[in-house]
Amino acid sequence: MGKIIGIDLGTTNSCVAIMEGNNTRVIENSEGARTTPSIIAYQEDGEILVGASAKRQAVTNPKNTIYAAKRLIGRKFDEKEVQKDIDLMPFTITRADNGDAWVEVRGQKLAPPQISAEVLRKMKKTAEDFLGEPVTEAVITVPAYFNDAQRQATKDAGRIAGLDVKRIINEPTAAALAFGLDKQDKGDRKIAVYDLGGGTFDVSIIEIADVDGEKQFEVLSTNGDTFLGGEDFDQRIIDYIIGEFKKEQGVDLSKDVLALQRLKEAAEKAKIELSNSSQTDINLPYITADASGPKHLNIKLTRAKLESLVEDLIERTIAPCRTAIKDAGISVSDIDDVILVGGMTRMPKVQEKVKEFFGKEPRKDVNPDEAVAVGAAIQGQVLSGDRKDVLLLDVTPLSLGIETLGGVMTKMITKNTTIPTKFAQTFSTAEDNQPAVTIKVFQGEREIASANKLLGEFNLEGIPPASRGTPQIEVTFDIDANGILHVGAKDKGTGKENKITIKANSGLSEDEIQKMVKDAELNAADDKKKLELVQARNQGEAAVHTVTKSLSEHGDKLDAGEKEKIEAAVKDLEAALKTEDKAAIDEKTTALMAASQKLGEKMYGDAQAAQGAEAAGAQAAASGSAGAAAQDDNVVDAEVKEVKKG
């Protein structure tokens, strides 16, 4: 078996690494560089350029040079972030037939995984040239806060590039592997990985422990923003230059695609220079021309000015850090080391902000551009069986569940659960003789299902006629090691089952994810009220069902007055159930239970008489029912409602 290579598929730059024995090796590409720009150019003659060669010709071919394709991967065209990018990118972002965001190049529509596959192909070739043998297997990294659709799309990109993707691994986790593997410290260490790359931001809290000579990397929590990175910092510089030039020369460069491409290059260069010097000159001769002749651009940019332009972007990274610390159940003082990953963390202001939040100097012994690829290569060695002393325990970033009676979100797997994981719960039907149930799968933190993101739905049909609550429908959630979700439903009585894998075209935007979490906090009280109303309603409906059934079976044992009293209480409760008044529902439920007490006594008396008649048999029956009760412990008192198809 050949080597499993590690690839960091970045928004701005990509990197490939391998393991040589116990040593990691970042491989130089054909131009001799250890990182490759994630830029793809489509030439007029059909040739495709990738990396530095694509970057060099971007100024003369802006409409057919694609960069930051990772920002579009697994996303819908209508998403706010995609719409924002449409106005900024020189190339055309278009809507695909399935609603996804694709790119149009030379009259041809291309999916982001197709474009990213070109970068992966270059990484594959880089490794093959170095090893002198074909490479077919890889571990590819993604931002920890990537959702199901984005992970699936990244896997698809690998397949398009001719790679069998053995594992999708989270970038901060990979960086922790690279950092922690050669550390000889005994005892547990908690580290924070702050990963600010070209297009995405992640933070993970990871515990590194020595367990019987094995290094265990356990992710305690993760958070982030998949639409925040170096590209946004560059854009602030570009906007500033455009504004200054307009003031000086009266010319607006924002509509000139050739000028924009030169500005992008200059902005990135200035940003990098200002990490080491206090000011830089942005000098672009012949940037444009008007009736009076050619115009030259010459602007001084100081580090202080840059910091003021991007202050809010840096500040945006702190809230996810705070949430990650809280979700991990620790305090900032418990963090032993802070690791910086991603090129943007070279910016002094970013380092200063991180130091201010975590109260300690970030480590400088990790290469922010290479650590992620190195970690992916280590994981590749673990998967190939060549390394036995590493155990990696990652997590899922958001809660997953299904909609149950009353529109409640019944969470099956909560956020920050270690993966791979599998969880099953038994539900039942909401109506008598219900032939099918619709399983709706949601992702998010809200208590009411409709406030979360619908990932997919499917039917389980052919349920034999039975009274409500009798059929046993087992719903299974299974998240694999790549963080991809599979859901199944099985009728325990008939053995019939149905399964769904959440597909890439049902992606979740980072904005939606953040909105869900924020909404969950803001609307916690509102959700609580709705939840209490649903619970009261479910209780009331169950009471109506039970009493009505008992009345039909044992009503003849009551005198007419008692029976009428119960029937009236049932009517009152049924009327209350149609309202939104929880207090009224509770009151009428209590009234019905009180009114039906006599009926209960009659039923209890009959049962006692029957018991006395066969005392010996009763003991055996009791032991049998105890066993049955134990078996039913995993049955949850929640119900799935059938969605009637018109």
From Swiss-Prot:
InterPro entries: ATPase_NBD (IPR043129), Chaperone_DnaK (IPR012725), Heat_shock_70_CS (IPR018181), HSP70_C_sf (IPR029048), HSP70_peptide-bd_sf (IPR029047), Hsp_70_fam (IPR013126)
Expression triggers: By stress conditions e.g. heat shock.
Molecular function terms, GO-annotated: ATP binding; ATP-dependent protein folding chaperone; unfolded protein binding
Matches recorded under CDD domains: ASKHA_NBD_HSP70_DnaK-like
Annotated keywords: ATP-binding, Chaperone, Nucleotide-binding, Phosphoprotein, Stress response
Pfam families: HSP70
UniProt entry tagged with the keyword Oxidoreductase: no
Spans annotated as Disordered: 606-646
Compositionally biased residues, Low complexity: 607-631
Positions of modified residues (Phosphothreonine): T200
Family, similarity comment: Belongs to the heat shock protein 70 family.
Role this protein plays: Acts as a chaperone.
Protein name, UniProt field: Chaperone protein DnaK
Gene coding for it: dnaK
